Regions:
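Extracellular/periplasmic carbohydrate-active domains that bind, remodel
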Residues: 1-350
Length: 350
C-alpha cells in the first residue's frame, strides 16, 4: 500500500503515529494534519485517539485499507461536547477543499456512551462532523459503532459522500448514517450500505432542514434550506428507515433519490411531520425512482408516510417485495397540501 502514496504526501508515521491499538496517537495525527502537507497518509494499524482530530482547508487525509481510527475508552466523557472522531477545524469562518478517504472510523460506543441530551457540554456521539465546508469529499470509509450519527454535515456546499459502509455491532438509538442539516446544497450521497440486523438504527440518509438543534448530537447545526441533492445506491438488509425528508418551514428543494435496495423496519421514505404542527412542511421537486424494498416484519407502519406538505413529488418504479398486508405501502394525510404522482407495485408472489 505504501507505493500508492503520492510523493507530496506525508505519512502520519513520520509524526510519531504508532497504530498499535494502545498508544494515544491523537498528538501525532494532529501534528501531521497541522504540518502544512496537503495530503496526509495514515498507515494500517489501530490508531487510538482521545480528542477530536481537526482537519483544515486544502487537506486530504488518506487512510490505508487496514487503518482504524478509534475513540479511546472513556475519551468522550473527558473531551465533552466537542468530541468527534474528526471535524473541520474552522466552523466559525468555514473551511474548504477537505477530503477524507478510507479507513475504519470506530466510535467505540460501548466505552463512550452519550451524555445527557440537552446538557451544554455533553457528548452527542457523532462520528464525523463537517459544518460550513465548501467542497467536501468523504469516501471509502467504514463507520463503526458510532454512538449516534455516523457522518453529519451542515452548511455545506458542493459535497460528495460516497462508498460508506455502516458496520455497527453495538446498536444504539439515533444511529443515522448520513445526517444533513440546514443550509446544505449541491451534494451527492451515494453507495451507502449497511451490514447486519438493526443497522442502521435510525435514518440511513436524513435531509433535515428543520430539527431540534438543541439536542447534543445536533449542536452546531442550523435550521435552513436544503437543495439540489442526489441520493443514490442505498442498501441495507434491516434499516430502520432508508431516507428521511424533514421540514417545518425551511425549504427542501430539488432532491433526487434513486436505487434503494433491501429491507427496512420502519419506513422506506419518511415524510412524516415528527414534532411539527399539522400542515407544516416546505418540500418541492422531489423525484424518487428505482426502489426495490421489503417491509421487514414487526409493525404496521406504512413504508412511505406523507404527513408534511409537498409539491411536485414523483415516485416511479417503486417495487415492494414483501407480501405482508399489515403495513400499507403509502399513507397520505388528505387534509394537507400534497401533490404526488405515484407508480408503486407489489412484486408477484413466487
Amino acid at each position: 500500500a505504501m507505493s500508492q502514496i503520492p510523493d507530496s504526501a506525508a505519512s502520519a508515521r513520520q509524526f510519531g503515529a504508532v497504530g498499535d491499538g494502545r498508544t494515544d496517537d491523537t498528538g501525532a495525527l494532529q501534528k501531521a494534519l497541522d504540518s502544512g502537507q496537503r495530503t496526509i497518509h495514515v498507515p494500517a494499524g489501530v490508531h487510538v485517539i482521545r480528542r477530536t482530530l481537526l482537519i483544515g482547508s486544502d487537506t486530504t487525509l488518506s487512510l490505508d485499507k487496514g487503518a482504524v481510527v478509534r475513540l479511546g475508552d472513556g475519551a468522550a466523557a473527558a473531551a465533552g461536547g466537542d468530541c468527534f472522531l474528526i471535524r473541520n477545524r474552522d466552523v466559525e469562518n468555514g473551511s474548504e477543499n477537505i477530503t477524507v478517504d478510507g479507513g475504519v472510523w470506530d466510535g467505540n460506543c460501548a466505552k463512550n456512551p452519550r451524555g445527557e441530551e440537552y446538557a451544554k457540554d455533553s457528548y452527542g456521539g457523532v462520528g464525523m462532523s463537517f459544518v460550513q465546508v465548501r467542497k467536501l469529499t468523504v469516501r471509502n470509509v467504514t463507520m463503526r459503532n458510532n454512538e449516534s450519527f455516523a457522518i453529519r454535515v451542515g452548511e455545506v456546499d458542493r459535497f460528495l459522500i460516497e462508498n460508506v459502509l455502516l458496520d455497527h455491532t453495538v446498536i444504539r438509538p439515533n444511529q443515522d448514517g448520513i445526517h444533513v442539516g440546514g443550509f446544505s446544497e449541491n451534494g451527492v450521497i451515494r453507495n451507502i450500505s449497511a451490514k447486519g440486523a438493526g443497522v442502521p438504527n435510525d435514518d440511513m440518509v436524513a435531509l433535515n432542514a428543520d430539527d431540534d438543534v438543541t439536542r447534543h448530537f445536533n449542536r452546531g447545526m442550523k435550521l435552513g434550506p436544503i437543495r439540489n441533492i442526489l441520493v443514490e445506491d442505498i442498501s441495507a438488509e434491516d434499516a430502520y428507515t432508508f431516507v428521511r425528508l424533514l421540514s417545518n418551514t425551511a425549504p427542501i428543494r430539488d432532491i433526487t433519490i434513486r436505487k434503494i435496495r433491501g429491507g427496512c423496519r420502519m419506513y422506506c421514505l419518511n415524510l412524516n411531520r415528527w414534532r411539527f404542527p399539522k400542515g407544516r412542511g416546505n418540500i418541492a421537486n422531489v423525484l424518487v425512482e428505482d426502489v426495490k424494498v421489503a417491509k421487514n416484519p414487526g409493525n404496521g407502519l406504512p413504508l412511505v408516510p406523507v404527513t408534511l406538505s409537498v409539491r411536485n413529488m414523483r415516485i416511479r418504479n417503486f417495487v415492494r417485495t414483501d407480501h405482508d398486508d399489515k403495513a400499507k405501502t403509502l399513507l397520505i394525510d388528505d387534509s394537507i397540501d400534497v401533490e404526488l404522482s405515484v407508480d408503486i407495485r407489489r412484486a408477484e408472489k413466487e
